[in-house]
Amino acid sequence: MSNHNEISSFIWNVCDDVLRGLFKQHEYGDVILPFLVLRRLDCVIEPKKDEIIELYNELKEEVDPTPIIKKQTGLKFFNHSNYDLQRLKGDPNGLKVNFPNYISGFSQNVFEILENFQLEKPVEKLLKNNKLYLLIDKFTEIDLHPN
């Protein structure tokens, strides 16, 4: 994981490169915090991502896959969509559809937290101004993996 100074510097660089002029300074946190959380979640899930997708797809028609996925992966949360921030970069033209798919793929315990961020409006603004891809690209550069 990056250290505090690296994370702080990263955040200010993102604000300068992506958010300045598009959002007011007091709105930066409405974008930065949720994307930091998303990146951290992705980094925790990353080693088990393919296993999660496979398990979810195998079980979803028969049972609630949540407890089985949690038990088998040892994680308390997961994302069963085919996307994470890194994979979203592979289809820049599909972000309008794929980003909501990514968000809705989180397990219920995380999805409820993400709903409270009310990301729809900032993401809509980023999409409209062709900045969502740039923001996602920036956030995939920072290492927020657990130590």
For the regions a protein language model found, what residue spans apply to each?
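Non-catalytic, mostly N-terminal accessory regions of nucleic-acid modification and defense proteins
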Residues: 1-147
